[in-house]
C-alpha cells in the first residue's frame, strides 16, 4: 500500500510524526505537509501564488514542507512527487478533535476531501486534546498518541482488505478516557457556539479574535455526543453537499413567478 501523509498542523507537528510511525509499518510512505500551521483553511488551494517546497526528514522518511495548504500538499504529492497517485491519503494526526459539520473548516478534513475529489480514498484522523494550548504547540509533550496510532494501524489493515474508496473521519479520545467503544455515527450540526472578541490595538484600531465555546449538550448519537462520552467516533464523508432539492424547489417556484412577471 502506497500512502501519502499530510496534515494541517504543519510539518513539525508531533501528530504528523505519530502518523508516519503508524503508516510506515503498513505501507510505503510519502510525506508532504504544510510548513506552517494551517488549521481552519478547509479545502482551500493556492491559485494566486506559487507553492514553495523544502526537503526535510520526518521520522527517518524524506518529506517535503510546502508553503501552501493541506489540499495543496495532496495535489502536489499525489500528482507531482509520486510516480502514480497513492492508494490512500492519511491526513493527521490532528491535535484536537474534528467533529460535527464544522469539519468543513478543517484543513485536516479538507485534505482528505481533496484526495477523494480526485479519486483517492482517505482517512482524516484527529486526537482529542484536553489542553487547549497543545492544539497549536508543536513542542507539546503531553499528548498521548498511543491509541490513535493503534487505531490508524488497524484501519489501514482493514481498508487494505475491504477495498474502501471513500473518506473516513476518525476522532480518537484521550487514551485515559476511552470507554472501549467504537461508534460509526453522523456528524453533529455544529461543535461550537461562536465567541467573537473585539479588541483595540495601541493606536486605537479595532480588531477581532474569532473563537468558540464547545457545545456540551449535543444531540444524542452524533459524533460530538459520543466522543464526549469517550468513544472512538468514525463518520464516512463525501464531497456531495447537495441539500434538500424539494425544499429548494418550493422557494424557486416563487422566483419563477417573480421573474415571469
Swiss-Prot record:
What is a single molecular function from GO for this protein? Answer: nucleotide binding
Q: What class of enzyme is it?
A: hydrolase
Cofactors demanded by this protein: a divalent metal cation
Q: Which reaction does it catalyse?
A: a ribonucleoside 5'-phosphate + H2O = a ribonucleoside + phosphate
Q: Does the keyword Phosphoprotein apply?
A: no
Q: What does this protein do?
A: Nucleotidase that shows phosphatase activity on nucleoside 5'-monophosphates.
User: Which superkingdom heads the taxonomic lineage of this protein's source?
Assistant: Archaea
Which HAMAP family has this protein been placed in?
Answer: SurE (MF_00060)
Q: Where does a divalent metal cation bind?
A: 8-9, 39, 94
* Source species: Methanopyrus kandleri (strain AV19 / DSM 6324 / JCM 9639 / NBRC 100938)
Cofactor binding annotation: Binds 1 divalent metal cation per subunit.
Q: What is its main location?
A: cytoplasm
Protein's recorded name: 5'-nucleotidase SurE
Question: What family is this?
Answer: Belongs to the SurE nucleotidase family.
**Gene3D superfamilies membership:** Survival protein SurE-like phosphatase/nucleotidase
Q: Which GO terms describe its cellular component?
A: cytoplasm
Question: Where found, per UniProt?
Answer: Cytoplasm
**What is the E.C. number?**
3.1.3.5
- Alphabetically ordered keywords of this record: Cytoplasm, Hydrolase, Metal-binding, Nucleotide-binding
**Is Phosphoprotein set as a keyword in this record?**
no
